[in-house]
Amino acid sequence: MGAKKSDFFDSRDKYLSFVNSTNEKSRIAFQLAKYLKNSKITKDAFRIFDAGTGDGSVICTLLSAVHDKFPEDPIIVVGKEISIDDINSLLNYLGYRFFEHKNLVFCITNASYREINDNRFTDCKLIKKELVGNSSFSFNQQLMNMGEVIRKNWDIKEDTSSTILRPKQRH
């Protein structure tokens, strides 16, 4: 029984087939949204750290609830993800969120948890994109056009002395 369970989670195709044919992602986002009723902005923005952004469906559904609670306040999201396929899916969702919430900043990284926790971003490469336009369609086009730039800079290698994943640097 243990081997079968392990095989299920080790096979990306089997896992994706399951999560994409159920409403688990929506249920997770709706459950998280319940905590917003007691949430307050304590500094300059409402901040979210998503420690496994995946394809973006959970965070984007949650962002619609955050917008409902804080419609004018700044929202800053830092998402961690290493899969370029998931990043491309995430970009497809984000145009609607940026259109709905004009004060949204979304940062996606493949830094390790240790680097994030220790604020060690010496090898960090920043790609900044300010969206222009007045429709979610226009925002989606701009985000989807970033795919190649991200792909060129998202390549990761595993350092043999640690588990830290580093973005490929162009010299």
Question: Positions of the model-derived regions?
Answer:
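Class I SAM-dependent methyltransferase Rossmann-like catalytic core
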Residues: 1-43
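Conserved class I S-adenosyl-L-methionine
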Residues: 43-57, 77-78
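Class I S-adenosyl-L-methionine-dependent methyltransferase module
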Residues: 41, 61-171
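Residues that form or flank phosphate/diphosphate-binding pockets in enzymes
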Residues: 27, 57, 88
